């Protein structure tokens, strides 16, 4: 699937747990990490008409879609995270969500499936493929991406943070403000009990919910709206 789809998948998945902004970003990026092996397409395209073309994409694509790199990604997540064990485990699961999505719909326009060499570099015996895998640009992938984008915007409206927080807290606040002005709710205007979340945002209600396990009255507002 598209890296955009993988990114949105990682973000939505990261919101299934109570994580600090840094850890949310780590879990989200873990869902995109396998596609680092796709960066070889840049030198391949730049050198395709030269006397010595670099076939880095053709040769190495999916070389990081492996259990070994999943463990490396989880290890890096563990080291960088503030909530280490939780973030490391979620990063490992987020990585595997990427593999699952590729099995669903990553077939090329020529009909070729990119097998996932899950056990490399230790073994080449297991090559993951799926009969009926749809093309990379097929309508199910588009629908999945649109649904994930909708959930991402809903999370921003509901909780007060979006993937934009990874690069700018100010831009994140502006997005949330715009969403809440466009789709107002009285809870955002008439606050109940006010507390402070671990990531510095104001919380309305007595308990912060997760996407997977929602609870009544859990609403996040940015510090300034």
Where does each model-flagged region fall?
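Accessible peptide chain termini
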Residues: 1, 224-225
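N-terminal membrane-targeting hydrophobic helices
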Residues: 1-195, 200
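Basic polycationic patches enriched in arginine
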Residues: 196, 201-202, 208, 224
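Short, intrinsically disordered C-terminal tails of secreted or membrane-associated proteins
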Residues: 218-224
């Amino acid at each position: 699937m598209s890296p955009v789809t993988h990114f949105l998948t990682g973000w939505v998945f990261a919101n299934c747990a109570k994580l600090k902004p840094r850890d949310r970003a780590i879990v989200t990026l873990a869902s995109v990490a396998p596609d680092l092996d796709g960066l070889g397409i840049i030198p391949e395209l730049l050198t395709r008409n030269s006397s010595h073309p670099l076939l880095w994409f053709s040769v190495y694509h999916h070389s990081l879609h492996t259990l070994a790199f999943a463990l490396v990604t989880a290890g890096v997540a563990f080291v960088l995270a503030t909530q280490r064990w939780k973030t490391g485990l979620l990063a490992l699961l987020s990585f595997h969500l990427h593999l699952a999505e590729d099995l669903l719909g990553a077939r090329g326009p020529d009909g070729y499936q990119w097998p996932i060499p899950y056990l490399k570099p230790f073994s080449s015996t297991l090559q993951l493929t799926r009969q009926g895998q749809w093309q990379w640009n097929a309508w199910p992938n588009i629908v999945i991406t649109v649904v994930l984008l909708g959930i991402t915007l809903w999370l921003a409206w509901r909780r007060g943070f979006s993937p934009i927080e990874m690069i700018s807290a100010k831009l994140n606040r502006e997005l949330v403000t715009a969403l809440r002005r466009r789709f107002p709710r009285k809870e955002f205007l008439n606050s109940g009990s006010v507390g402070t979340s671990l990531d510095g945002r104001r919380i309305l209600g007595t308990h912060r919910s997760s996407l997977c396990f929602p609870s009544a009255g859990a609403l996040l507002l940015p510090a300034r709206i």
